[in-house]
Amino acid sequence: EVKLVESGGGLVQPGGSLRLSCATSGFTFSDFYMEWVRQPPGKRLEWIAASRNKGNKYTTEYSASVKGRFIVSRDTSQSILYLQMNALRAEDTAIYYCARNYYGSTWYFDVWGAGTTVTVSS
């Protein structure tokens, strides 16, 4: 069974940091692009970051809203995807999901975790 399980969310003050984790199982983690997507309260899903395999190395990509503040990485030995979030703002409040990108360069995210909630508030 393919599973993604996010953790690490919580309440943090503006300017603070959090690290989210996405533990994966049931597939060859290193073979897939992995994505982070969030949903702010009352708003649509927003793609924010990706870790993508290009040959034998991984590249990262970010949305303009988080670039320079968030860092996506992966531990292939433990099949875990991470999202280090720095300089957090109130507008980063959201449910954060990791997703597997099945087709690679397209926007077909076939497996999602249940999400972890991040609240940025003083």
Swiss-Prot record:
InterPro entries attached to this UniProt entry: Ig-like_dom, Ig-like_dom_sf, Ig-like_fold, Ig_sub, Ig_V-set, IgHV
GO biological process, one term: immunoglobulin mediated immune response
Name of the protein: Ig heavy chain V region M603
Highest taxon of the lineage: Eukaryota
UniProt GO cellular component terms: extracellular region; immunoglobulin complex
Residues at the site labelled H-bond with the phosphate group of phosphorylcholine: 33, 52
Organism per entry: Mus musculus (Mouse)
Miscellaneous information on this protein: This chain was isolated from a myeloma protein that binds phosphorylcholine.
Organism ancestry: Eukaryota, Metazoa, Chordata, Craniata, Vertebrata
An annotated Gene Ontology molecular function: antigen binding
Span of domain Ig-like: 1-121
Signal sequence range: none
Keywords per UniProt: Adaptive immunity, Immunity, Immunoglobulin
Any Pfam family matching the protein: V-set
